[in-house]
């Protein structure tokens, strides 16, 4: 309930959710898929919803529920936000914010917001920017706050924080825009100190976009150029040979420690075993999500404990998917932490919770309840 809204006190009313999706990042289409899944799962006895899409050019537009519900992959084609739809705006009020649709010189359908669920992946959505906007507008929102969102979006900053908190991770090199443009040979020399294969990634990207697996130094410049199409800052990670890619879902709690799911394993049936964009999102790909992962009990507990430690250390709230590598001897290291993981009904994060009895609709409800319960402002 919005603070100060006297007309609603004591009434059994539905909370008003602002669903935001799309965005100006390269993960726009994945965000649309996520929005469709969440909208279909929303408990309509608990929540009313207003849908706002952010077109690739940055326009905020009002999208009707029927259109969002229809978002799906059709013949390998992904949905996008239609920039020609009517503009949508947020209006700051004494008790929070309203959302409205622009109709000529008028604002129509003006609706107060109790909580926002920004289903945005990557820059301008998962990186603290929209979280800062919601803070300024006095709107509660699902997920991590400004600082932890920004840190976790930047793979280099995140790994630096892992080191500060004695959380194990693999070797890596950061290549900034200034370093690459001024002395690429020095950058290649630093990368050469890591063992091949290398994974060259946009430092602030996601959904495996712009990532290249490289086995020889001659291919590094092209891989860096590819990553720089998505982000001027690049991270090069030493490949983890012989390890299994295991993921764990973490869910915040109103009381006590965050909750960790049983871990799941990504089993890619290709020679490179690289979990790229196609294997993540397109149908009929050579990949299995094994839930729960076939691991000894002590290793499972090690993964879960490390996931919760990372969640707490980086100040994350609401949800995160923590990606790890598990070696044959049982050693576990962190790969990364995602504050807004893929969230369709078939994505790893919801599937991990479903495997332990938390269905998709219940998971969405828990996240909204967590956001509604937390105070506004710094915390």
Task: Give a label for each model feature.
Residues 212-305, 326, 331-333:
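Phosphate-binding site of ATP-dependent enzymes
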Residues 2-147, 151-157, 164, 175-188, ...:
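ATP-binding N-terminal substructure of ATP-dependent carboxylate-amine bond-forming enzymes
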Residues 49, 140-141, 169, 198, ...:
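Hydrophobic beta-strand scaffold residues
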Residues 31, 170-174, 197-223, 245-247, ...:
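Glycine-rich phosphate-binding loop of ATP-grasp-fold ATP-dependent ligases
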Residues 2-3, 8-16, 20-24, 44, ...:
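ATP-dependent carboxylate activation and anion-phosphoryl transfer catalytic cores
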């Amino acid at each position: 309930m919005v603070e100060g809204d006297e007309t609603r006190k004591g009434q059994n009313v539905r909370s008003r959710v602002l669903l935001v999706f799309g965005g100006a990042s390269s993960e726009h289409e994945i965000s649309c898929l996520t929005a469709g899944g969440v909208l279909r799962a929303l408990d309509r006895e608990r929540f009313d919803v207003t849908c706002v899409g952010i077109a690739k050019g940055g326009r905020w537009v009002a999208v009707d529920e029927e259109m969002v519900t229809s978002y799906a992959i059709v013949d390998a084609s992904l949905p996008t936000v239609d920039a020609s739809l009517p503009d949508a705006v947020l209006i700051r009020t004494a008790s929070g914010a309203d959302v409205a649709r622009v109709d000529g010189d008028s604002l129509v359908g003006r609706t107060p917001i109790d909580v926002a669920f920004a289903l945005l992946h990557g820059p301008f959505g998962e990186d603290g920017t929209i979280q800062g906007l919601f803070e300024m507008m006095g709107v509660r929102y699902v997920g991590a706050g400004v600082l932890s969102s920004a840190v976790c979006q930047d793979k280099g900053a995140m790994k630096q924080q892992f080191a500060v908190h004695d959380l194990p991770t693999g070797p890596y090199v950061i290549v900034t825009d200034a370093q690459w443009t001024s002395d690429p040979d020095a950058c290649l020399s630093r990368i050469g100190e890591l063992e091949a294969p290398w994974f060259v990634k946009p430092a602030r990207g996601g959904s495996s976009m712009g990532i290249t697996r490289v086995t020889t130094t001659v291919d590094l410049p092209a891989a860096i150029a590819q990553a720089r199409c998505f982000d001027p800052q690049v991270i090069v990670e030493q490949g983890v040979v012989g390890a299994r890619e295991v993921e764990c879902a973490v869910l915040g709690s109103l009381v006590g420690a965050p909750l960790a799911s049983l871990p799941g394993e990504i089993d890619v049936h290709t020679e490179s075993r690289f979990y790229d964009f196609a294997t993540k999102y397109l149908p009929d790909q050579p990949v299995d999500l094994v839930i729960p992962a076939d691991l000894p009990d002590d290793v499972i507990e090690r993964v879960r404990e490390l996931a919760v430690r990372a969640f707490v250390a980086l100040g994350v709230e609401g949800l995160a998917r923590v990606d790890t590598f598990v070696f044959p001897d049982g050693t576990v290291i962190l790969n990364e932490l995602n504050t807004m993981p893929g969230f369709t009904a078939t994505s790893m994060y919801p599937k991990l919770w479903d495997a332990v009895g938390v269905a998709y609709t219940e998971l969405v409800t828990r996240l909204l309840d967590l956001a509604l319960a937390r105070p506004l402002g710094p915390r």
